[in-house]
């Protein structure tokens, strides 16, 4: 567990029995939803996003805890989710297949980061790369 140390890559997710994020295709699990979080082409490939605000650029994250969406933040931290924990990952822990970049909309109330594929790859390979980061996410204990 780690204390919040300012900016980084944060995501609120459900904790599994083993103390790591739950894998799955949902907004509060470690995974990406095809057609929602990223859009595969007709051949099932995903590509490095342009990181345009509002586009489906990949795994949705935030640069600070305060920028996480209220529906995902744990109740005890002032959010509305009774099941989530706040997690942090270092950009260097993403691996060569993934890239993170801020893609905040100009008039947005909160800032946003997406973790997308670093190049062209089949969707399933991208999903595996995201889920392979599971052990790299650390729980944040104080905000």
State the predicted function of each range.
Residues 1-143:
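NAD-dependent ADP-ribosyltransferases
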């Amino acid at each position: 567990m780690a204390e919040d140390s300012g900016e980084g890559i944060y995501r609120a997710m459900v904790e599994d029995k083993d103390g790591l994020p739950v894998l799955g295709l949902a907004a509060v699990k470690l995974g990406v939803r095809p057609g929602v979080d990223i859009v595969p082409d007709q051949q099932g490939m995903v590509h490095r996003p342009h990181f345009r605000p509002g586009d489906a650029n990949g795994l949705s994250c935030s640069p600070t805890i305060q920028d996480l969406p209220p529906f995902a933040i744990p109740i005890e931290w002032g959010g509305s989710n009774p099941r989530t924990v706040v997690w942090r990952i270092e950009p260097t822990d993403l691996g060569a297949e993934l890239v993170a970049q801020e893609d905040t909309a100009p008039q947005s109330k909160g800032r946003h980061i997406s973790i997308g594929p670093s190049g062209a790859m089949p969707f399933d390979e991208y999903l595996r790369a995201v889920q392979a980061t599971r052990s790299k996410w650390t729980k944040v204990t104080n905000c």
